[in-house]
């Protein structure tokens, strides 16, 4: 098992990575939550049949009372209505401020459960048990929790750090191949922005079997990079913006597909390639880098370009949290392994994307 400690002002928590951790969830939670009597587990309709009873048995074996709440799988559950249902279910279960909420699922479950934990009873302890690769390397680490509004994704949320993150690579075995590779888009992103050697390591292992054989190392490397960024910039005002490489344009592709045609990972993959090509045009990115990135992503079965209208680009740029007034910070690559924010007028960005 590998352990990373995220140290933030006034508090810290561990990210634990290891095969078989799901069956040891009870003892791991008891170690960090000695005074809790109840764990309120939030999961979804895909994950519950696979892993809920295993986690429940482990938690009960450690002396916790367990209440489980299952939401429909999919982005549609990350909404205010589901959040309100969750609050009421927590109150029905008798949740107290000494108890805890555990998210057992992917990014939707983690965001929804985390926002509920941040707001119920003015905040209760929260544990992440991510079951998708995307959630393991991205949304479960860093404390961002949110729900979507009709105006866009993640517009109502909070920063609420977990007490513990448990990552069991075994859960990735049950992911459909497209969902597994969707997570690999975020994995590749870490190599692009911070570690060229890690990018080369991934590019040399394009098959799922090769990647799973190295999964503890992959998860550890990604989480170590994200930890270093989050420790420097918990509230997403500076260094943490680098994690959004590929996301500004990726959100445009998600919007163009009405959030159903393209997965988040596929959109980010295409967004990274578009950002690399943009960087070349702006004189920031080396000319050979886009092809190198496209080859690695194509080998993983991910798209390197997605059709998008000027209107969708404009809508995504308008909602981007890195924008201020008439300008926006776009994350570009100076070289493989080094990302930088590039401030430019929104109008210029939209013109470059035509």
PLM regions with names:
Residues 2-4, 12, 185-187, 284-354:
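C-terminal charged capping/lid subdomain of soluble metabolic enzymes
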Residues 67-69, 102, 127-129, 164-167, ...:
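Hydrophobic/aromatic beta-strand patches that form the interior of the parallel beta-sheet core
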Residues 87-104, 113-128:
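Non-catalytic interfacial helical region
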Residues 108-115, 136-137, 252:
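Short glycine/serine/threonine-rich phosphate/pyrophosphate-binding segments
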Residues 16, 115-207:
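A glycine/threonine-rich phosphate-anchoring loop and its flanking beta-alpha core
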Residues 200-311:
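Active-site segments that bind and position negatively charged phosphate/pyrophosphate groups
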Residues 1-100:
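ATP/NTP phosphate-donor binding region
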